[in-house]
UniProtKB/Swiss-Prot annotation:
Belongs to the Schlafen family. Subgroup II subfamily. Ribonuclease which is part of an E2/17beta-estradiol-induced pro-apoptotic signaling pathway. E2 stabilizes the PDE3A/SLFN12 complex in the cytosol, promoting the dephosphorylation of SLFN12 and activating its pro-apoptotic ribosomal RNA/rRNA ribonuclease activity. This apoptotic pathway might be relevant in tissues with high concentration of E2 and be for instance involved in placenta remodeling. May play a role in cell differentiation. The lineage of its organism: Eukaryota, Metazoa, Chordata, Craniata, Vertebrata. This is Ribonuclease SLFN12. Changing residue 573 to E: Decreased ribonuclease activity. One of its GO terms (molecular function) is ribosome binding. Residues 551-560 are annotated as: Mediates interaction with PDE3A. GO terms for cellular component: cytosol; nucleus. Gene3D superfamilies: Schlafen, AAA domain (3.30.950.30). Its main location: nucleus. Phosphorylation at Ser-368 and Ser-573 negatively regulates the ribonuclease activity. Dephosphorylation is induced by the interaction with PDE3A and stimulates the rRNA ribonuclease activity. It comes from Homo sapiens. Its EC number is 3.1.-.-. InterPro entries: Poxin-SLFN/SLFN_N (IPR031450), Schlafen (IPR029684), Schlafen_AlbA_2_dom (IPR007421), Schlafen_AlbA_2_dom_sf (IPR038461), SLFN_GTPase-like (IPR048729).
Length: 578
């Protein structure tokens, strides 16, 4: 897999470069190298999974085939099917764009609200028996299976036996097949072409492989069948029986059987398991080779494998789920994956009734004027547009007094904004848990209706490093809005960098909006929900408490329009403090 993080991108996004990819339905159908087509599909799918689990971003693919046109040729059915296998509703998460010789896939962050799952998974690699089939559990089934195991702290290796005998009537059940398979397993000799007295079921699987590819085929199928039987109720795998349920057997020397038994043991012992119980036992199985005789002469063998049901969870291989960590695309470890699947998400106060309750006990001084008047007086600095909320007011005033030209610059920048909130900070980077840049004068985050958030960075030192600072801050902010704040819509954060000279002159040194293009859906943001998500993210990061008084500035951060349903409650809360 050749996926790398593009560190030179202009986007304030996680951009994953998947290399050269052939695109278009006809072109992908005509690819002679099927392995290459599969590898390209795998790389795109893993990159998508990694971005979904890492706050969203962009997949960048260099277009392999000449004269490709997205509008004429499309993407390719195999890729589209992979997208559908990952996502229930593809348009909710993905947007596609061709930019010259590059194809870009914009990926929105995974949303817990969509499926109830905290992460995206390409394959759980947890198998189960569904009557006569071994099937991999989808993420939802895996979640239920793991939750049940965690709740019960595992299970007994064997099903409890019935205490009372049932009436002996002419009833046939699956357990009859399992019992007959057990009798067959205990035999020492078999007759060629002998018919079985049982068939495939939840507890029985029958296979017939040619001698030439016997070892290879057993190694290929063994993990999924062992996982399926162990995760269900145990069962038997018989190799050397045909579709007509006749005993055929395979030819082998004794040394071949020894090698085969060692490979089976090696394969089973390296299968990943996860325990919720205290015993932490190994997979319990028995392997034997039953001699097949034709008119009294040994002519082959049947491989018989009995797998006991397991106490906890058995994987065929590690879960196929990815994320971006330390600028690398990495597969989640089994432990990480299970924690994301079954551990409860920490709950943080997000209801405004709870927020109001905090205000009642947190406000340091009484307010005798009505809430709306208090809101108006605290929101707007004199001389600035009433369409924009500026906060925190004290920092805003101080910056305007200390730095000539900043107020005029802000007025000019906000002139075209219909309605918005401009939130100042000495360092948004520090607020988000990143490293401080002492050369930065301040940052300001603009959140307005139907327009992407804009992060303004102001500095008084000529230095090119501010682009990296601003880009990283914007990227982190976007990720926090989605993963911590719970913002479920598509969003991007634009950046703009200004230089303020000691004489009060200002100049724009960088404007991301002139450098990159996003799909249309990224420009229609919801200000109200962005502010809510921002509040939740900062509250969890404790930036609100660290930067300025939590209660005193709560309304300024969220905005009065977000509280319209609770105006009466808030008014009463404030009045009780007088």
């Amino acid at each position: 897999m050749n996926i790398s993080v593009d560190l030179e991108t202009n986007y304030a996004e996680l951009v994953l470069d998947v290399g050269r990819v052939t695109l278009g339905e006809n072109s992908r159908k005509k690819m002679k190298d099927c392995k290459l087509r599969k590898k390209q599909n795998e790389s795109v799918s893993r990159a998508m999974c990694a971005l979904l689990n890492s706050g969203g971003g962009v997949i960048k693919a260099e277009i392999e085939n000449e004269d490709y046109s997205y509008t004429k040729d499309g993407i390719g059915l195999d890729l589209e099917n992979s997208f559908s296998n990952i996502l229930l509703f593809v348009p909710e998460y993905l947007d596609f764009m061709q930019n010259g010789n590059y194809f870009l896939i914009f990926v929105k962050s995974w949303s817990l609200n969509t499926s109830g799952l905290r992460i995206t998974t390409l394959s759980s690699n947890l198998y189960k028996r569904d009557i006569t089939s071994a099937k991999v559990m989808n993420a939802t089934a895996a979640l239920e299976f793991l939750k049940d195991m965690k709740k019960t702290r595992g299970r007994l290796y064997l099903r409890p036996e019935l205490l009372a005998k049932r009436p002996c009537v002419d009833i046939q059940e699956e357990n009859n097949m399992k019992a007959l398979a057990g009798v067959f397993f205990d035999r020492t000799e078999l007759d060629r072409k002998e018919k079985l007295t049982f068939t495939e079921s939840t507890h029985v699987e029958i296979k017939n492989f040619s001698t030439e590819k016997l070892l290879q085929r057993i190694k290929e199928i063994l993990p999924q069948y062992v996982s399926a039987f162990a995760n269900t109720d145990g069962g038997y795998l018989f190799i050397g029986l045909n579709e007509d349920k006749e005993i055929i057997g395979f030819k082998a020397e004794m040394s071949d059987l020894d090698d085969l038994e060692r490979e089976i043991e090696k394969s089973i012992r390296k299968m990943p398991v996860h325990h919720f119980c205290m015993e932490k036992k190994k997979i319990n199985y028995s392997c034997k080779f039953l001699g097949v005789y034709d008119k009294g002469s040994l002519c082959g063998y049947v491989c018989a494998l009995r797998v006991e049901r397991f106490c906890c969870a058995v994987f065929a291989k590690e879960p196929d789920s990815w994320h971006v960590k330390d600028n690398r695309v990495m597969q989640l470890t089994r432990k990480e994956w299970i924690q994301f699947m079954v551990e409860a998400e920490p709950k943080f106060s997000s209801s405004y009734e709870e927020v109001i309750s905090q205000i009642n006990t947190s406000l340091p001084a009484p307010h005798s004027w009505p809430l709306l008047e208090w809101q108006r007086q605290r929101h707007h600095c004199p001389g600035l547009s009433g369409r924009i909320t500026y906060t925190p007011e004290n920092l805003c005033r101080k910056l305007f007094l200390q730095h000539e030209g900043l107020k005029q610059l802000i007025c000019e920048e906000m002139d075209s904004v219909r309605k918005g909130s401009l939130i100042f900070s000495r360092s948004w980077s520090v607020d988000l848990g990143l490293q401080e840049n002492h050369k930065v004068l301040c940052d300001a985050l603009l959140i307005s209706q139907d327009s992407p958030p804009v992060l303004y960075t102001f500095h008084m030192v000529q230095d090119e490093e501010f682009k990296g600072y601003s880009t990283q801050t914007a990227l982190t902010l976007k990720q926090k809005l989605a993963k911590i704040g719970g913002y479920t819509k598509k969003v991007c954060v634009m950046t703009k960098i200004f230089y303020l000279s000691p004489e009060g002159m200002t100049s724009c040194q960088y404007d991301l909006r002139s450098q990159v293009i996003y799909p249309e859906s990224y420009y229609f943001t919801r200000r109200k929900y962005l502010l809510k998500a921002l509040f939740k993210a900062l509250k969890r990061l404790k930036s609100l408490r660290d930067q300025f008084s939590f209660a005193e500035n709560l309304y300024q951060i969220i905005g009065i329009d977000c509280f319209q349903k609770n105006d009466k409650k808030m008014f009463k809360s404030c009045r009780r403090l007088t």
